[in-house]
């Protein structure tokens, strides 16, 4: 064989080896980059915000009040709530996190308790700053919680209804043990808090004390919600969401796909009142129709015209209250009403 042919073969083999090494290196770098980005998505969405909600640097707040004072004008109902005295309670969940709950007692003795479940990156008193007065004026007790990794409660990771519904079931046991085994409970959740109470409503262990659920602007599942948000941002869903879910399953210990409110309401144990704004572009309005159609128990639906996400109550308080009162009239014992 001529020498130049052997040389050519060596050159070709070297080129192939170099190509394989380069391709392997590129794939490795892509894998590392994918892992890093997936983890960052997981951490940004699921990990607790480092700042405690409601706390603002005094100088920053003063500057904002000077430049944009209308942002600090409180609704009279919120001002009223700020003047009320709450009883503080706590439980420790199965993860070892101390969770906080706050009771606004009715002016007169009542066996009706509204369990308030707040949304993502919010906290109890903030979410129910307007609605608390409505229920209090009806003569009901209002019990508001801070979910894990929110407000004054401990915890590192947000469960999007998975951990929160588990913890809320523990809160219900605490309530019946503390306030009476025969109390009547109304579940009321907003956004992620809505997903929480929907999952509770389909739990076969839901106590008979729960009389009905108000489900305000909840998503069908976090997987579908994240898919919707990524597509809106023109970001490819796959494999990014799969990667984030991989970290979520191993770190936060739940699967985005298995937090399924549609499945839960299909086994609902109590009547359900679904509420959603027609202009909700965060949790799109179509989701409430899927949830309503899947619900297996007595149900009703209120669509609030022009309301954005979690804005149905301030947008049309009268319609909202009227629909809730219709459920109260139907499902709460007469002697317990205001």
Residue spans of the language-model regions?
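Alpha/beta-hydrolase active-site loop
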Residues: 158-179
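Hydrolase active-site cap/lid region
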Residues: 199-255, 263
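Catalytic active-site module of serine/aspartate enzymes centered on a nucleophile-bearing elbow/loop
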Residues: 315-338
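The serine-hydrolase catalytic nucleophile loop
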Residues: 120-134, 147
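Short beta-strand/loop motif that positions the catalytic acidic residue
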Residues: 267-268, 274-276, 280
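Conserved alpha/beta-hydrolase
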Residues: 135-154
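Catalytic histidine neighborhood in serine/cysteine hydrolases
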Residues: 293-310
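An N-terminal hydrophobic leader/cap segment in hydrolases
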Residues: 27-92
């Amino acid at each position: 064989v001529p020498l130049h042919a052997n040389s050519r073969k060596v050159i070709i083999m070297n080129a192939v080896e170099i190509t394989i090494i380069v391709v392997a290196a590129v794939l490795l770098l892509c894998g590392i980059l994918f892992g890093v980005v997936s983890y960052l998505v997981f951490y940004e969405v699921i990990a607790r915000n480092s700042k405690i909600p409601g706390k603002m640097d005094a100088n920053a707040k003063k500057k904002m009040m000077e430049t944009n004072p209308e942002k600090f004008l409180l609704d009279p109902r919120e001002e009223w709530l700020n003047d009320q005295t709450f009883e503080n309670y706590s439980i420790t969940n199965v993860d070892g996190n101390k969770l906080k709950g706050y009771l606004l007692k009715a002016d007169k003795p009542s066996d009706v308790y509204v369990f308030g479940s707040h949304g993502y990156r919010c906290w109890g008193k903030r979410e129910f700053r307007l609605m608390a007065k409505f229920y209090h004026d009806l003569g009901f007790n209002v019990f508001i919680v801070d979910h894990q990794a929110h407000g004054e409660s401990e915890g590192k990771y947000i469960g999007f209804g998975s951990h929160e519904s588990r913890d809320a079931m523990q809160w219900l046991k605490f309530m019946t043990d503390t306030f009476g085994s025969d109390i009547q409970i109304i579940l009321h959740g907003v956004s992620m808090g809505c997903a929480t109470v929907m999952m509770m409503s389909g739990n076969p262990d839901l106590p008979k004390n729960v009389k009905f659920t108000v489900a305000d602007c909840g998503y069908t599942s976090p997987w579908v919600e994240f898919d919707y948000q990524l597509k809106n941002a023109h970001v490819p869903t796959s494999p990014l969401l799969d990667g984030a879910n991989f970290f979520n399953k191993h770190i936060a210990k739940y699967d985005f796909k298995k937090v399924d409110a549609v499945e839960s309401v299909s086994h609902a144990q109590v009547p359900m009142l679904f509420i959603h704004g027609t202009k909700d572009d965060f949790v799109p309005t179509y989701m409430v129709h899927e949830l309503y159609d899947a619900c297996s128990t007595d149900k009703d639906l209120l669509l609030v015209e022009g309301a954005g996400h979690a804005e149905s109550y301030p947008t049309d308080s009268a319609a909202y209250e009227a629909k809730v009162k219709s459920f109260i009239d139907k499902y709460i014992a007469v002697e317990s009403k205001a």
